[in-house]
């Protein structure tokens, strides 16, 4: 199983909607969205995936962006109130995989879901902070989540033992787009070849965007296009 991890920027959401609409996502691909904003595009993407019955993970407590503050600051009778209502209704559909990041607000979210009858066995959980592994063990000691994303590190391997999904940032991001000229072609990943041998049920990455999230954009002096392709040895390489 492949879990492409995106941050829910406008262009990423539009790309996902296009892929879903045109049935271009295989059964083995489950996108993960960490929404950075409560927007009509986000709820439209959810609606499209529900329509075509393709599973998608939506993180309810994103660590970046303004989604959480957008949610809390919604005013009654506003257009944002409509987005919030649609999001909440669609989030209950079985196509949407309820997901959370193990961080400061994870405990309260788990308690909220428990009160509302959400089964922990249906959740996708993201473990990237070792400080919250004890909370993970406490919350999922008797119930194993559907998917547990984690880096390939010894402490995480000891603490997260079941339904493990490898999460890694494979993209070697440069400071400037022009710098990619110095390395026009390079290795990207071989996780798809070995993840089962390493004890994982799936793998996840941030594609050619990378894990780094910047709140504000800027106009670059150069434009870089990144193309991921299969090499002869079945590994993935990226050409800039």
Residue ranges of model-derived segments:
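N-terminal, charge-rich interaction modules
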Residues: 2-8, 23-26, 36-38, 179-190
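Conserved, mostly hydrophobic/aromatic
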Residues: 16, 31
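A broadly used, surface-exposed interaction patch
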Residues: 47-120
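A short, Lys/Arg-enriched amphipathic alpha-helix followed by its capping loop at the start of a domain
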Residues: 19-27, 49
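Active-site-adjacent beta->alpha loops and helix N-cap segments on the catalytic face
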Residues: 40-43, 106-113, 132-138
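Catalytic beta/alpha-barrel core
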Residues: 4-8, 33, 55-62, 96-106, ...
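Extended alpha-solenoid helical-repeat scaffolds
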Residues: 80-87, 99-101, 127-128, 133-137, ...
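Long, charge-rich C-terminal accessory regions
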Residues: 135-240
